[in-house]
Amino acid sequence: MLTLPNFFALKSLRKSIRIIHCMALGKLHEFKIFGIVQHAHLLGRAITTRHFRNGTELPPIAVDPNYDFDFQEARLLRTERSVQRGDSLMVECTYDSTARTTPTLGGLTTRDEMCLSFVMYYPKIPLTNCLSAPIYDSIDKDERAVWTTLKAYNWTSPQVRQTFKQKVRESSIHHQCIGAQMNPKYLEFVFHEYLPQEGYIPSSSTCP
């Protein structure tokens, strides 16, 4: 499972959240993905699970450009996808919170938000989920001060929204992969997000 943890702050407008999830493969050199469930809450409008290898973006694992909270289902892939050691997966969610007047936080309630991708794969490895989240160290080194700052933002200002977006991009990312019952922690580290300058470009359609 690839997740966006509940301490992520979602600003009050439409945006995409990009969080890279590095997979802990143990002694395996690859595993095969054969199905997927992508999930967000009421503000979710689109979800894509993206795949990166050696600095290049590969075709996405799954794309849902018209996500509907009331219509969610597990989907089998038409072709199994190989994930190799060193690859990265990223769950990208687009939200529309223009009808709300206050920031939306990540969390478990329906009015909170999530950005999840439940991946079905084989062979089995003792791993339940990988999660990543910005730690907002580009805003303030003190986590308590960060929340005070975010609550004071004037989210109706385009300049404030653009500044926040840039600060998130500059923030360090906390990442961990964990096993059953939250133990053991296979990986836990802080890194800076890197995305290729050029994303995946799908081939042109041959349909008339």
Model-inferred region functions:
Residues 1-208:
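Beta-strand-centric surfaces of beta-sandwich/beta-rich domains
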